[in-house]
């Protein structure tokens, strides 16, 4: 089933079941299918003053779906088991598609897992420019960095997800 351009309704027109099925039901089903089947792969990046080294055995993945200007996304980064380095400075995380850079700053949520003490942290995602966002740890309200709220090391995990309006 393909998208059908929505009909321009005329005053006093009789709305039939066939018209509603074509212009409402079928298009809504198409939009629902795009959200499920329309995911694209994306490789998120973490940058800082000195970029972190994820090490051997690391895992980086992400997916996003775009319907019009609406972008839904998720990402997962796991540091490897050896050869990791936290780098230095505030962490900035790439977005799959440039955002419009004018709407609300909060564009999602996430979790961080510090494997050493087996501790999880919750965070909000704040856009910083059209292509990147940063994490704000929920309890301390500090920006996530190479040393806050913990220094990432072997097997630590960052996960994030959200929805935002794209630039185009």
What name fits each language-model region?
Residues 3-56, 100-104, 109, 154, ...:
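Glycine-rich, low-complexity segments
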Residues 81, 117-121, 140-146:
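Short, surface-exposed beta-strand/loop "edge" segments at domain boundaries and coil↔beta transitions
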Residues 50, 97-138:
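Extracellular attachment/recognition segments
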Residues 1-4, 74:
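Short acidic (Asp/Glu) and glycine-rich catalytic loops that position anionic groups and cofactors
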Residues 43-49, 74-80, 138-141:
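Generic short beta-strand segments
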Residues 64, 86, 126, 151-153:
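Sterically constrained small-residue positions within well-ordered secondary structures
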Residues 57-116, 159-165:
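Beta-rich globular "head" domains
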Residues 128-168:
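Domain-scale recognition of soluble eukaryotic interaction modules
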């Amino acid at each position: 089933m393909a998208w059908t351009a929505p009909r321009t309704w005329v005053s006093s027109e009789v709305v039939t079941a066939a018209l509603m099925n074509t212009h409402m039901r079928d298009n809504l089903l198409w939009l629902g299918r795009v959200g499920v089947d329309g995911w694209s792969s994306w490789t998120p990046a973490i940058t800082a003053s000195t970029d972190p080294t994820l090490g051997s055995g690391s895992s980086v993945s992400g997916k996003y779906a775009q319907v019009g200007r609406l972008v839904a996304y998720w990402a997962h980064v796991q540091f490897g088991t050896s050869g990791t380095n936290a780098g230095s400075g505030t962490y900035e995380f790439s977005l799959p598609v440039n955002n419009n850079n004018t709407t609300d700053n909060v564009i999602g949520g996430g979790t961080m897992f510090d494997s050493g003490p087996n501790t999880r942290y919750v965070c909000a995602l704040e856009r910083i420019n059209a292509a990147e966002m940063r994490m704000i740890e929920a309890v301390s309200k500090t920006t996530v960095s190479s040393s806050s709220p913990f220094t990432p090391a072997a097997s630590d995990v960052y996960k994030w997800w959200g929805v935002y309006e794209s630039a185009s």
